[in-house]
């Protein structure tokens, strides 16, 4: 089992959404890790329909989610966005297919860890994101879009998501001793930015950005929520009732 998989399953087992879209679904491993009944649909360019899934389609997710999909309480995108040339379209259409207060869970390789940044400095390419000249073919398993927590946060906020959270993965952080030394300036910078934050959003962002998972982790698991107008109205009403 890959280190990010139990983290994703744990989040869903806590949320217990009645409807889930798994895109890309791959082998359909996710359904087997859930401890509750749910309707799970899947989208994938290559994979065959998993036996336990409901609706399944072969879809190029680089074109976004299909317009005629219904609404879901959760959408999961494991190891997908690094393959997308147009991730903003995916996030936009994911929000359109989530109910108010719905959850998006994303996993992807992280390129902020010190060894990755050192390799980029020496070669110009991140680990797992090699030069693809001579192998460029649309629709194949190419890693074309490197991500850090900061970049993922930006794309999610641009597409209207809230409560963006970076989740811890059980992996060595750092993996190598020298990475602790190379990662220290970045941790110090994030700590300084957190101390200078003017808003709660800034403080939360820099706390996640400066965490061991963000600076030293090899993978990212990030969840985000669509706005829920009903909750916002309730909070405003409660605030108005205070003496």
Segments predicted by a language model, with ranges:
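Class I SAM-dependent methyltransferase SAM/SAH-binding core
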Residues: 25-64
């Amino acid at each position: 089992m890959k280190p990010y998989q139990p983290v994703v399953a744990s989040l869903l087992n806590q949320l217990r959404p009645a409807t889930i879209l798994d895109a890309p679904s791959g082998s359909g491993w996710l359904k087997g890790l859930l401890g509750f009944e749910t309707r799970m649909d899947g989208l994938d360019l290559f994979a065959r329909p998993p036996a336990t899934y409901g609706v399944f389609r072969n879809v190029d997710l680089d074109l976004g989610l299909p317009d005629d999909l219904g609404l879901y309480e959760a959408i999961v995108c494991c190891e997908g966005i690094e393959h997308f040339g147009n991730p903003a379209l995916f996030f936009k259409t994911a929000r359109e297919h989530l109910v108010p207060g719905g959850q998006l869970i994303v996993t992807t390789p992280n390129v902020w860890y010190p060894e990755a940044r050192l390799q980029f400095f020496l070669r110009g390419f991140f680990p797992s994101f090699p030069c693809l000249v001579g192998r460029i073919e649309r629709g194949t398993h190419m890693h074309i879009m490197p991500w850090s927590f900061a970049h993922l946060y930006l794309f999610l906020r641009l597409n209207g998501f809230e409560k963006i959270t970076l989740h811890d993965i059980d992996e060595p952080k750092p993996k190598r001793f020298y990475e602790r030394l190379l990662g220290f300036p970045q941790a110090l910078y994030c700590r300084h930015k957190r101390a200078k934050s003017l808003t709660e959003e800034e403080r939360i962002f820099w706390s996640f950005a400066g965490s061991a998972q963000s600076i030293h982790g090899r993978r990212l698991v990030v969840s985000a929520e669509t706005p829920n107008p009903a909750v916002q109205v309730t909070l405003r009403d409660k605030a108005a009732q205070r003496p």
